[in-house]
């Protein structure tokens, strides 16, 4: 598989290089040179998740990684289901929270960990990543205990749920966590500064586990095929998929799936009050506002890193950006959506509720609606309990970590302090 740097097309790398390197020159994102449609999508949709995913990724990776190795990586990473649940209103929820950290990022995080371990040379690797909630847990658990790989996770202090924090800040070992005095965009800015520091990159073998890493993105392509595989065959080509969107890696993966031949009609980018993209699609003006804290904190992103990949893919395929559905919901609307979902006997959390609400608003009569449920409701127990007057029980993984002490250190949003921490 060959990939190029969107900012500097002359920089071309293999899949293994892209996984190890994370970003290209000038903070450029890597993107596949070829996205040839799959030969027989209908036959693929009849296969089990792991077998189908291995074939999709083998198609993408080509001769670089033997098919048997791809299958091995997938079978080690995808050890949990992604069920499609039909609601009373006729829409479908794709539940992506059945992995070890109860969030959709288990798919990408675990596949990336397997890839990095497989492609690792004898050099030390330091994974530096920022999280607005779910990435931290998925990455921490995927890499915990892997030899020769150290993980450093930045997160905005006081701006993720206590249970999210407990899931990745209690492990220790090769997982180090830093609570940054700032918002998620400040955390991402620190990560970008680190990747601009060539001496630092070389000294600690810097890599990223955010959705800017191509391995995470390609793994996420697979669950879009799983969603469509579980739909009635007559409904597939009419499917509209609503995607909770923060850093826009999830939507990018869906569009790649469509480019590979997945029979879906269109997508909806669902955001909270941090609505840079919906406003951009309406006005053509890219105007990020100051990030605001919301109930759906994993989407509290005003400067989504993956948006250039969306634009690049649409440019290459000749897809007009205007055909991409989008919209935002504020906290009051999110609360109302959670209550209406509960009246349908479906327990959700804020991110999924936003996707469902916008799906209902934008779905035509002849279309079939699917929305992504990206996290288990218990990961947002405080807000879900308060809004719905419930006491959501904690699943095993959350209950276990809820009792452990936090191991994070606190740092200001200053690169000099972060650099000293990394090399110290």
Spell out what each predicted region is.
Residues 1-424:
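PLP-dependent amino-acid enzyme catalytic core
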């Amino acid at each position: 598989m060959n990939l190029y740097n969107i900012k500097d097309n002359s920089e071309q790398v293999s899949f293994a290089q892209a996984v190890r390197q994370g970003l290209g020159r000038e903070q450029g994102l890597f993107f596949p040179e070829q996205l040839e449609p799959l030969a027989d999508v209908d036959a693929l949709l009849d296969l089990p998740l792991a077998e189908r995913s291995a074939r999709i990724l083998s198609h993408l990776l080509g001769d670089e990684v033997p098919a048997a190795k791809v299958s091995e990586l997938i079978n080690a990473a995808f050890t949990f289901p992604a069920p499609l649940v039909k609601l009373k209103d006729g829409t479908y929820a794709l539940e992506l929270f059945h992995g070890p950290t109860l969030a959709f990022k288990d798919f990408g995080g675990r596949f990336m960990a397997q890839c990095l371990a497989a492609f690792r040379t004898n050099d030390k690797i330091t994974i530096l990543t920022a999280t607005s909630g779910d990435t931290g847990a998925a990455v921490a658990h995927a890499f915990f205990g892997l030899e020769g790989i150290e993980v450093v996770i930045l997160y905005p202090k006081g701006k993720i749920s206590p249970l999210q924090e407990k899931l990745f800040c209690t492990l220790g070992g090769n997982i180090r966590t830093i609570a940054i005095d700032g918002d998620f965009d400040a955390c991402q800015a620190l990560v970008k500064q680190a990747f601009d520091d060539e001496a630092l990159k070389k000294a600690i073998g810097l890599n990223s586990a955010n959705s800017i890493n191509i391995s995470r993105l390609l793994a996420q392509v697979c669950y879009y095929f799983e969603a469509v595989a579980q739909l009635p065959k007559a409904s597939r080509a009419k499917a509209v998929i609503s995607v909770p969107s923060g850093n826009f890696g999830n939507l990018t993966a869906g569009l790649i799936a469509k480019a590979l031949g997945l029979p879906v009609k269109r997508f909806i980018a669902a955001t909270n009050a941090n609505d840079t993209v919906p406003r951009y699609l309406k006005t053509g003006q890219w105007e990020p506002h100051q990030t605001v804290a919301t109930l759906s904190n994993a989407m509290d992103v005003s400067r989504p890193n993956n948006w250039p990949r969306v634009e690049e893919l649409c440019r290459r395929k000749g897809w007009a950006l205007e055909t991409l559905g989008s919209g935002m919901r504020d906290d009051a609307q999110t609360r109302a959506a959670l209550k209406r979902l509960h009246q349908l006997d479906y327990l959700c959390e804020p991110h999924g509720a936003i996707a469902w609400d916008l799906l209902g608003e934008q779905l035509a009569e002849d279309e079939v609606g699917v929305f992504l449920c990206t996290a288990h409701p218990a990961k947002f127990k405080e807000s879900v309990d308060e809004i719905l007057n419930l006491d959501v029980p904690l699943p095993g993984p959350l209950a276990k970590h809820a009792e452990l002490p936090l191991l994070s250190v606190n740092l200001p949003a200053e690169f000099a302090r972060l650099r000293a921490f990394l090399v110290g």
